[in-house]
Regions:
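Hydrophobic transmembrane alpha-helices and immediately adjacent juxtamembrane helices
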Residues: 2-278
């Protein structure tokens, strides 16, 4: 039986120190091939722009989407896109657990004094993915400057809080969906429906979704707290489910609860892992 909470002789601070060194080594290795690294970084920026192109085409045909103007939807796009991109850099490697379980190589993660999740993240860390942050970051800056927001202190604070909480939500979703691999092995497509699919959902107001899907992204997989509720709070827009705009203030608590749930599920999954040789 594996111990997923093993933290080595120096505790969690020691683990984070080891993680930073492993990530640093990975970055230095990638930087040895600078031309390739830069090209891959630029390609990530261009790929991120495809979703924005779809939104631009949509607003070439309509003036507003469920009462949201182009700049207001751009605000959704920026908040969700930045959060997703940062989570992609640090947490998307969790989905590789299924590949290692299937190949019988997950056992090696259990023999080292570092949590398997951090080993997965550090081992496949790719800084080039940070290129996906650039484009939604620019869109977010333009949207914040161009929309009519009453910049009270609480609204100013909401922007970094929403970005941090949204990153945690996406990271937790990656870990949760990847945990299923310990029972079914093949989970990447299942996980993509909630991670990459969830990123697409955060780009639009939930007003355009059907009632059951609105409830799903609000109460089950709380993607509405990534961009929709924070943006509605900034813009003082009403919610189709009748929730007050202050629902956005629950964003940090929701992200923390989801992160704790993800940790519990992952730990339980690793604890009951049986290697191919057992």
């Amino acid at each position: 039986m594996a111990d997923p909470d093993r933290t080595g002789s120096h505790g969690w601070r020691g683990e984070l120190g080891v993680y930073r060194r492993l990530v640093g080594a990975r970055i230095r290795s990638d930087w040895q091939y600078r031309a390739s690294f830069v090209l891959l970084l630029v390609s990530q920026v261009l790929v991120a722009g495809l979703d924005l192109a779809v939104i631009a085409v949509l607003f070439g045909r309509v003036d507003a989407l469920a009462g949201w103007t182009a700049l207001e939807v751009a605000l959704l796009y920026g908040l969700g896109g930045v959060a997703f991109a940062v989570a992609d850099v640090f947490a998307s490697q969790a989905e590789l657990a299924g590949r290692h379980i299937k190949a019988g190589t997950f056992d090696r993660f259990l023999l080292r004094p570092l949590s398997p999740l951090l080993q997965l993240s550090a081992g496949e860390f790719a800084l080039r993915r940070a290129g996906r942050v650039v484009q939604p970051g620019v869109v977010l800056a333009v949207a914040l400057a161009g929309t009519d927001i009453d910049w009270t202190p609480d609204r100013v604070a909401m922007v970094p809080v929403a970005l941090a909480s949204g990153t945690v939500v996406f990271g937790a979703v990656w870990v949760l969906t990847s945990s299923v691999a310990f029972w079914t092995v093949e989970t990447q497509e299942f996980g993509n429906a909630f991670t990459y699919g969830g990123n697409h959902l955060t780009q639009y107001p939930i007003d355009v979704l059907g009632p059951w899907l609105r409830r799903l992204v609000t109460f089950v997989v709380p993607l509405a707290f990534v961009a929709y509720f924070p943006a509605a709070y900034l813009l003082d827009k009403p919610d189709p489910l009748g929730a007050p705009s202050e629902a956005a203030l629950l964003t940090p608590a929701v992200s923390l609860a989801l992160a704790l749930a993800a940790r519990a599920v992952w730990s339980n999954a690793v604890r009951h892992y049986r290697s191919t040789g057992s």
